[in-house]
């Protein structure tokens, strides 16, 4: 139990017991001290100020959860940090319309979250763990991935957790990272990539003419994305440049151009020039503060 010091004008022992009892009651256990005090006042009752409630509840370890139901559990997977290429990959599957109504092609895409390079893809007529396993094995071979160096993140779909896929990852020494079903936004890199793909001007409004045409379109997209697309999340360099470690030199050159422009015409600049420093780390599922930081109110005990 936390040791909380109460001012001399604080609530009496009887009042503290009443605060605990009221706060745990079915009518108030879902509410914050601010809400409890307001509703008690509406009913013509006063037990203490908001700060009194906070101190009493903190003393009794009741600030976090007072319901009978199970406390909320943070379902987000652990944060994954990449400081170099080929440390964390993200992958997913998206649908592409085929000429046959109600039938689809399945595009498997693997992206390095540090460089944003597409490191592997196939376009298939079925969705399966076997296709996924072959994709990951081929990408690992092409990128020269050593055992124990790579984490592969995906959602919780059947191809991602199929026996063939998991056995392949174990054999390759790749650590799987699966999202939780209740978390909708913990594969943002793949989601962003698919949005870029489907908003390309050349992406058909209807269906592709056939599998070969669709594969050729994806091939051109991957080439453009990796080697021509100046990605906003990596300081507008191409994924290939960043994957090969060329981004720092490119960004240094840009910084020099801006500094020279400022030197020639300083009145145009009110502060620093644009930030062209290289991004040194990328995080997937960064942990935000999952608790409410409680600052005790400064209202006096009255």
What is each model feature region?
Residues 20, 37, 54, 215, ...:
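Non-transmembrane alpha-helical segments in soluble domains
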Residues 292-298:
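Conserved small/polar residues in nucleotide/adenosyl-binding loops
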Residues 47-49, 62, 76-109, 113-224:
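RNase H-like DDE/DDD metal-dependent nuclease/strand-transfer catalytic core used by mobile genetic elements
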